[in-house]
Structure formats: structure tokens, C-alpha cells
Amino acid sequence: VCRDWFKETACRHAKSLGNCRTSQKYRANCAKTCELC
């Protein structure tokens, strides 16, 4: 679980879309975030 609620939400949202890498809105945090979640 991510410490940052926003990042955790972004991670879950990106995973739910099935494509973390191309999620432009969360692109900056997505790679690191998804590894933590």
C-alpha cells in the first residue's frame, strides 16, 4: 500500500485501466507508484 493516498489512488486507477505506462495524467508517478502498490 502506498503511503501517499493520491499516488495509491492513481496506481489503482491506472491498473484498473490496464495500462499504467500510457496514463498521461499519472505518468510522472505511475511507474514508481505501481511498483510500490
From Swiss-Prot:
GO CC field: extracellular region; nematocyst
Outcome of swapping K25A: 60-fold decrease in affinity on Kv1.1. >500-fold decrease in affinity on Kv1.2. 20-100-fold decrease in affinity on Kv1.3. >80-fold decrease in ability to compete with alpha-dendrotoxin
Pfam families: ShK
Region (Crucial for binding to potassium channels): 25-26
Feature type site, description Important for binding Kv1.1 and key residue for binding Kv1.3: Q24
Annotated consequence of substituting R3A: Small decrease in affinity on Kv1.1, Kv1.2 and Kv1.3
Keywords linked to the UniProt accession: Disulfide bond, Ion channel impairing toxin, Nematocyst, Neurotoxin, Potassium channel impairing toxin, Secreted, Toxin, Voltage-gated potassium channel impairing toxin
Protein name, entry field: Kappa-actitoxin-Bgr1a
Additional record remark: Negative results: does not act on Kv3.1 up to 125 nM of the toxin. Does not show effect on crabs.
Mutagenesis / variant outcome for changing K7A: Small decrease in affinity on Kv1.1 and on Kv1.2. 20-100-fold decrease in affinity on Kv1.3
Physiological role: Inhibits voltage-dependent potassium channels of the Kv1 family (Kv1.1/KCNA1 (Kd=6 nM), Kv1.2/KCNA2 (Kd=15 nM), Kv1.3/KCNA3 (Kd=10-39 nM), Kv1.6/KCNA6, and KCa3.1/KCNN4 (Kd=172 nM)).
Sites annotated Important for binding Kv1.2: R12
GO molecular function: potassium channel regulator activity; toxin activity
Site (Important for binding Kv1.1, Kv1.2 and key residue for binding Kv1.3): Y26
Family membership: Belongs to the sea anemone type 1 potassium channel toxin family. Type 1b subfamily.
Effect of T33A: Shows distorsions in the dichroic spectrum. No change in affinity on Kv1.1. Small decrease in affinity on Kv1.2 and on Kv1.3
Species whose genome carries this gene: Bunodosoma granuliferum (Red warty sea anemone)
Site, Key residue for binding Kv1.2 and Kv1.3: residue positions: F6
Signal peptide from the UniProt entry: none
Impact after mutating W5A: Small decrease in affinity on Kv1.1 and on Kv1.2. No change in affinity on Kv1.3
Keyword Secreted: yes
Impact reported for Y26A: 20-fold decrease in affinity on Kv1.1. >20-fold decrease in affinity on Kv1.2. 20-100-fold decrease in affinity on Kv1.3. 28-fold decrease in ability to compete with alpha-dendrotoxin
